[in-house]
């Protein structure tokens, strides 16, 4: 218990934008997350890592209320700017706009490249074409896609490559001005060149946004993360400064995972 308190105290040296307290999640009888106390530092890249089935993706989904599905049950607190997002007064649509999500497999909407980026604004009532044009261009430029697609904005998003589709999904998330971007293994289905472009993009974005990436790839976490959360069997084993954890992990489980003794 004392070790857990010490780890959390060290973690709180970072300014958190998200944090959980005694977070528990069940899928039916399966207890997926167990008393999870974690922080996500503001405007940094946090990597959530751990072996398959440990609860990484469940934790990510808990951060913007994507667990509101049949059979799932959530207990505990998740705070965004000190507001419990699971309270009765919290608006899930506002939460999901401020805390965007990008999934493992690129999921472009069945519409044009332009309309994919403009979609969120239109849903929120924006009709001004000049404003939509500006937002579409600005966010396609942010993800390094504008020069590749500016002459075919009305083409189907499905005509893009896998890496381009994933960058388009990130642009769509950025268009509604989130503060946090959650990414669930966003490069696992991409080739090495596309993976490198996504990683470079996330580094550029981290100065303006809080980035949280779930990854099973330790080397990717080493390349990207400033802060690390290690999960094993639904529990937080270790969290803190990435450099410190990778150089001097306090838990034998963390050390074994980093060495590749299990995955």
Question: Language model features by range: what are they?
Answer:
Residues 177:
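Conserved catalytic motifs of ABC-family nucleotide-binding domains
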Residues 239-240:
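ABC ATPase "signature
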Residues 77-94, 154, 245:
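ABC ATPase NBD Q-loop/coupling interface
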Residues 83-84, 130-150:
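Conserved ABC ATPase "signature" region
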Residues 181-184:
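Catalytic Walker B motif of ABC-type/P-loop ATPase nucleotide-binding domains
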Residues 155-160, 164:
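Conserved ABC ATPase signature
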């Amino acid at each position: 218990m004392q070790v857990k308190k010490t780890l959390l105290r060290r973690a709180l040296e970072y300014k958190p934008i998200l944090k959980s307290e005694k977070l528990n999640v069940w899928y039916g009888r399966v207890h997926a997350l167990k008393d999870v106390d974690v922080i996500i530092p503001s405007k940094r890249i946090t990597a959530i890592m751990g072996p398959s089935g440990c609860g990484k993706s469940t934790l990510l989904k808990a951060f913007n209320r994507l667990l509101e599905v049949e059979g799932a049950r959530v207990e505990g607190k998740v705070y965004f700017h000190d507001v419990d997002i699971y309270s009765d007064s919290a608006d899930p649509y506002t939460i999901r706009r401020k805390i965007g999500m990008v999934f493992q497999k690129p999921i472009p909407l069945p519409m044009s490249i332009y309309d994919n980026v403009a979609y969120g604004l239109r849903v929120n009532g924006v009709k001004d074409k000049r404003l939509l044009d500006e937002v579409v261009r600005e966010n396609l430029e942010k993800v390094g896609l504008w020069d590749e697609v500016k002459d075919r904005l009305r083409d189907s998003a499905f005509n893009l490559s896998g890496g381009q589709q994933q960058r388009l999904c990130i642009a769509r998330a950025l268009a509604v001005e989130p503060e946090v971007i959650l990414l669930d293994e966003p490069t696992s289905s991409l080739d090495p060149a596309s993976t490198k472009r996504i990683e470079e993009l996330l580094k550029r974005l981290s100065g303006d946004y809080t980035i949280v990436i779930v990854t099973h790839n330790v080397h990717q976490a080493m390349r990207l993360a400033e802060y690390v959360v290690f999960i094993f069997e639904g529990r937080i084993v270790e969290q803190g400064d990435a450099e410190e954890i990778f150089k001097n992990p306090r838990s034998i489980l963390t050390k074994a995972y980093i060495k590749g003794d299990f995955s």
